[in-house]
């Protein structure tokens, strides 16, 4: 399991994503992602539990066992409203990854994936401290959707010359 905090960005017409953090208990994922892609992986204990055929519960704990995230969600299987289509495409059709190494140098690379299948979601969020480390206060979601995911491939990153 993995939990990420990201933002959407653009550089020279390349629409991409930048990760503030990627949390996982998996040591090989953290090592590979940090060394090969300069991604900010953090060690976390993540409890992922399927509570019913459709409902999932996720809790994330820091290494000191403080709860960072507690959410329950359920994909409805229903497609999003047409009025949300442009925003959904803007957030999911990103084909570049940006990252910064420890020396502050910017890197980028292509990301390959099929279109994300998106559906409506119901959710209950009882704890979200994932953004506190960055000085950002959690705000209630204006819009939320769910995807069962797609396979992605990130090409090796290259240094950006500016």
Where do the protein language model's features map onto the residues?
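Internal, well-folded beta-alpha domain core
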Residues: 4, 8-162
């Amino acid at each position: 399991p993995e939990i990420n905090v990201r933002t959407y960005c653009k550089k020279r017409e390349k629409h991409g994503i930048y990760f503030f953090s990627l949390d996982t208990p998996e040591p090989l994922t953290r090592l590979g992602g940090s060394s090969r892609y300069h991604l900010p992986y953090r060690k976390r204990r993540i409890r992922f539990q399927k509570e019913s055929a459709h409902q999932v519960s996720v809790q994330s704990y820091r290494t000191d066992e403080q709860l960072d995230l507690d959410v329950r969600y359920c994909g409805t299987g229903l497609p999003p409203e047409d009025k949300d289509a442009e925003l959904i495409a803007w957030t999911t059709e990103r084909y570049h990854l940006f990252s910064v190494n420890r020396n502050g140098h910017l890197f980028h690379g292509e990301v390959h994936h099929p279109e994300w299948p998106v559906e409506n979601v119901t959710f209950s969020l009882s704890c979200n401290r994932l953004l506190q480390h960055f000085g950002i206060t959690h705000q209630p979601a204006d819009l939320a959707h769910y995807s069962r995911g797609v396979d992605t491939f990130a090409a090796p990153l290259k240094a950006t010359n500016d």
